[in-house]
């Protein structure tokens, strides 16, 4: 069996520390925390990591459709768009059926 090689060509992230991997990295280096006091009485938590002040770009999703999708879809689109832009993979002649994306979510 032949082993297939993989390459990680771009990463994208969004969390309580920032809206992209660069912001998250820089805030982490400065010792900042993405955890804050929960002010939502419907959540049974005292502290949590909240994504604040985030608005998905109109380029990623038509403004008329934004309300149709939950916030986690907006976050996934943002992170995957960042990874694709970092990779520059869409500007190559690679077989797109050989390209994949791995997405992880933590709650």
Would you name each region that the model predicts?
Residues 1-107:
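Conserved "HGTGT" condensation-loop signature of ketosynthase/thiolase-family condensing enzymes
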């Amino acid at each position: 069996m032949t082993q297939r090689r993989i390459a990680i060509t771009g990463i994208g992230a969004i969390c309580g520390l920032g809206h992209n991997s660069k912001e998250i990295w820089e805030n982490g280096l400065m010792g900042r925390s993405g955890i804050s006091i929960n002010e939502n009485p419907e959540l049974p938590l005292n502290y949590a990591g909240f994504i604040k002040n985030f608005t998905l770009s109109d380029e990623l999703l038509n403004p008329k459709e934004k309300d149709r999708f939950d916030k986690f879809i907006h976050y996934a689109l943002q992170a995957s768009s960042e990874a694709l832009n970092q990779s520059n993979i869409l500007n190559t002649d690679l077989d797109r059926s050989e390209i994949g994306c791995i997405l992880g979510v933590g709650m």
